Amino acid sequence: MAQKKQLYVFSDFDGTITLQDSNDYLTDNFGMGNANRVNLNQQVLDGSISFRDAFAKMLDSVHLSYDEALEVLKKNVAIDPSFKPFYEWCKSQDIRVIILSSGMEPFIRALFEQYLGKEEASSIEIVSNDINVHPDGQWNIVYHDDSHFGHDKSLTIRPYAQLPESKRPHMVYCGDGVSDLSAAKETEHLFAKKGRDLIKYCEREKISFSEFETFADIHKDLQKLFFSS
């Protein structure tokens, strides 16, 4: 009897797992402001600027120390309440969850720690950019790779997609915005958050997707797609 394929859930973090995008929150409130950020996002969608360059402009406009930025995010950025039960269900079903983020790992783990607890926050799989904190408390992003995305999420997914059919897992991706463009075509099923830029991109490029509002929606859809008898 053939062994049942494992399911891998790849997910963006900011704006997908979180209710607010942490990088957008910093940029809008302590940097260039909402209008300028939205304009840069539109330029990324249009292809007139790379995500890497746009993101650098956004973060460079934020004048907070690392500690200040971390405290601001912990006070103001919440995680989708349905993510914790979703994640616990995934673990119970041997579903591998991998966070693919264009954000920065120290911020991500700190937010997870508030909502999942220290043990889960330290063990959850995260592939993301990092942070270099300077002696004076200032900080800068350290990109994951040299791509024009800064973190090309497709590079993590593709090796699994290229496995022989018998060894290839089922794969889904969950995302919301311009940082997810590189991953949008890489999995067999895509979940795109309602009202966000990723849907605009998918509609323009004719990429099929399922719309979601919370991880409760994704939970239900995964049960129908992969666990219905």
Swiss-Prot record:
Cofactor(s) the protein requires to work: Mg(2+)
Residues annotated as catalytic: 12 (nucleophile), 14 (proton donor)
InterPro entries: HAD-like_hydrolase_phosphatase (IPR050849), HAD-like_sf (IPR036412), HAD_hydro_PyrdxlP_Pase-like (IPR006384), HAD_sf (IPR023214)
EC code(s) of this entry: 3.1.3.50
CDD domains from the UniProt entry: HAD_Pase (cd07524)
Biological processes annotated in GO: chromatin organization; DNA damage response; L-serine biosynthetic process
Residues reported in the UniProt entry to bind Mg(2+): 12, 14, 176
Superkingdom in the source lineage: Eukaryota
Entry keywords, A to Z: Chromatin regulator, Cytoplasm, DNA damage, Hydrolase, Magnesium, Metal-binding, Nucleus
Family of this protein: Belongs to the HAD-like hydrolase superfamily.
Protein name, UniProt field: Pdp3-interacting factor 1
Organism of this sequence: Schizosaccharomyces pombe (strain 972 / ATCC 24843)
